[in-house]
Amino acid sequence: MRILIANDDGLDALGIQTLAKYLQREYAILVVAPDRNRSGASNSLTLSRPIQPVKVVEGQYRVDGTPTDCVNLALSGVIDGDVDLVVSGINHGANLGDDVIYSGTVAAAMEARHLGRPALAVSLVGNLHFDTAAKVIMQLLKDSHTLELPAGILLNINVPDVPYSELKGIQVTRLGYRHKAQAPISAQHPKGIPSFWIGALSEPHDVSEGTDFCAVSKGYVSITPIHTDMTCYEARSPLTKWTDTITL
C-alpha cells in the first residue's frame, strides 16, 4: 500500500515528519505539504496564481499553497504517481468539535475523499507525544482490512497527549462543540492602520458523554466518522411547511 501524507502545519513540522518516520517502516509513502504553517486554511484552494510543488528530498514535496492544494496536486497525478490512502497530520493540537470547520488537517483528508481515496485526519491534543499518535495510526492501519465504511466518509482522529502506554483505549464519538470564539485582539500597526489578530478558540461547550471532547479528556483516542453532507434533515419538514405557504 502507498500512502500520501499531508498536513496544515507545513512540511518541516514535527508531527508530519514523525508520522512519515513511522509509516515508511511498513508502507511506501509520499509526503506533500505546505511550505509554511497553513493552520485554519480549511478547504480553500489557491485560484489566484499557479502553485509550485518543489521536491525537497526523495518522496517529499513542499507546495506554496494550502493543504487542499497539496492533496489535489498529489491525487491528480502531477506529483510522483498514485496512492491508495491519505493520512493528514499529525496536527499540532486538537481538531475537536467544530474545529473541523476551520481545520486544514481535516480539509486535506476531505479533499482526498472528494477525489475518491480513503482518508484519515489525525491530531495530537497537545504538542509533545507525537510518537503516541503515530503508533495509534500504525495500529489502525494494521487492522484496517476489516473496516468497511460508506463512500464519502473520512475519520477524524484525536489522540491524547500522553505516552502510548497511558492511553485508555479507543472510542467512536460524535463531534462536540465550543462556545463562540473569543473577540478579535487589536494589534499595533506602524502606520496606524486598524489591525487585529483573530480571537482564540473558546472553551468546549458540549462535552457530554459520546463526544470527542469527552473521550480525549478521559484518555481515550477519539475517532469520529464525518462527511461533507451538511444538510439538516430534521429542518426539512418544518421548512417545507413554511415554504408551501409562500407564493412567488
From Swiss-Prot:
Function: Nucleotidase that shows phosphatase activity on nucleoside 5'-monophosphates.
Reaction catalysed by this enzyme: a ribonucleoside 5'-phosphate + H2O = a ribonucleoside + phosphate
Compartments it resides in: Cytoplasm
Keyword Transmembrane: no
Protein's name in the database: 5'-nucleotidase SurE
Required co-factors: a divalent metal cation
UniProt record similarity statement: Belongs to the SurE nucleotidase family.
Major site of localization recorded for this protein: cytoplasm
Residues that hold a divalent metal cation according to the record: D8, D9, S39, N91
Root EC class: hydrolase
Gene giving rise to this polypeptide: surE
A matching Pfam family: SurE
Domain of life, per lineage: Bacteria
InterPro entries assigned: SurE, SurE-like_Pase/nucleotidase, SurE-like_sf
MF annotations from Gene Ontology: 3'-nucleotidase activity; 5'-nucleotidase activity; exopolyphosphatase activity; metal ion binding; nucleotide binding
EC number: 3.1.3.5
Organismal lineage: Bacteria, Pseudomonadati, Pseudomonadota, Gammaproteobacteria, Oceanospirillales
Keyword Repeat belongs to the record: no
Details of cofactor binding: Binds 1 divalent metal cation per subunit.
Record key words, sorted: Cytoplasm, Hydrolase, Metal-binding, Nucleotide-binding
Gene Ontology CC entries for this record: cytoplasm
